Amino acid sequence: MEFRILRYDDLDRDTLYDILALRAEVFVVEQRCAYLDPDGRDKNCYHMICTENGKMKGYLRILPPGEFFKEASIGRVLVTDRRKGIATEMVRRALDFIFKELRQDTVRVEAQTYAVGLYGKFGFETVGEEFMDEGVPHIQMLYKRKS
């Protein structure tokens, strides 16, 4: 498996198409969330793609501080093959990127509640109450790296 983190301007058309198609497949079709996925933030984010033999296996987006929350954030996490550790590896690499490249020690996510365990493995803690977003239960989680 190959993992790459790219800025929006570094995405070629085919990769961008694959990202948007995969996001639509998971969030719009599977989860039946009828919302505008391209939310205007993609151009200011980093995009992690996981590929194997030229096929996209996973994706997540890294939002720099101030783009959505005051802290850096991870969102739109999805994989084509579940329960194979791909999401865990992508989150691990995203955190490493945030710590080393963005020089941030705090990360906030709005996790779908079924994914609390994924983030909990890394030390994220829930903050606030569960809420509904596009009909799907979510909760905010916060990670503060220890010095």
Feature-to-residue mapping (PLM):
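Short hydrophobic/aromatic beta-strand element in the GNAT-like acyltransferase core
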Residues: C33-L36, C45-I49, Y59, E71, ...
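Conserved acetyl-CoA-binding loop-helix of GNAT-fold acetyltransferases
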Residues: V79, K84-D96
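Conserved beta-strand in the GNAT
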Residues: I49, K55-P64, E71-S73, L78
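Short amphipathic alpha-helix that is part of the acyltransferase structural core
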Residues: M1-N44, T51-K55
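Conserved acetyl-CoA-binding loop of GNAT-fold acetyltransferases
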Residues: G120-E130
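C-terminal "cap" of GNAT-fold acetyltransferases
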Residues: Q112, M132-S147
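Conserved GNAT acetyl-CoA-binding A-motif
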Residues: I98-A111
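Short acidic/glycine-enriched loop/turn segments that link adjacent beta-strands
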Residues: D42-N44, F68, D133-P137
